[in-house]
């Protein structure tokens, strides 16, 4: 068994996909696809669902991939906080945490915290929490 993909639900899937490509080096895996019909509703347990689905390759990886979905009818929810139960964040390893943070800010993201060392004396690991334009948490790690 292996992890196949991670999915984010977006208010604007094309814009969020562009952010991940620009700021973090993701690349399109396939063309954007519209999913609808009874089979989609049965599959995800939401009758009448209409979804725009975008798949992105993560940097330096063929799998797993990042899926960004936009539902036609989405009531919206506040962005998750660092202590919210459930999926907390996407973490990206980077050789230059400051440069990656600048790229995220330039592409429309925001900074959540400050750079800190979450590692040990033997294995330092600089980390920084950021947010994408829709408020999803991103952790940057530089080991």
Feature-to-residue mapping (PLM):
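Short solvent-exposed loop/turn micro-motifs enriched in small/polar/acidic residues
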Residues: 1, 48-49, 121-123
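Generic short beta-strand segments
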Residues: 32-36, 71-73, 116
């Amino acid at each position: 068994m292996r992890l196949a993909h991670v999915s984010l639900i977006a208010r604007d899937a094309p814009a969020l996909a562009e952010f991940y490509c620009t700021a973090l080096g993701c690349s399109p895996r396939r063309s954007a696809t519209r999913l609808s019909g009874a089979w989609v509703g049965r599959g995800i347990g939401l009758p009448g669902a209409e979804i725009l689905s975008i798949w992105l390759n993560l940097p330096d990886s063929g799998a797993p991939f990042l899926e960004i979905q936009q539902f036609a009818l989405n009531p919206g929810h506040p962005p998750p906080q660092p202590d919210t139960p459930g999926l907390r964040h996407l973490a990206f390893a980077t050789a230059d945490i400051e440069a990656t943070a600048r790229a995220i800010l330039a592409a429309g993201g925001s900074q959540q915290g400050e750079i800190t060392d979450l590692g040990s004396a033997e294995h330092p690991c600089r980390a920084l929490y950021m947010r994408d334009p829709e408020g999803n948490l991103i952790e940057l790690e530089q080991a």
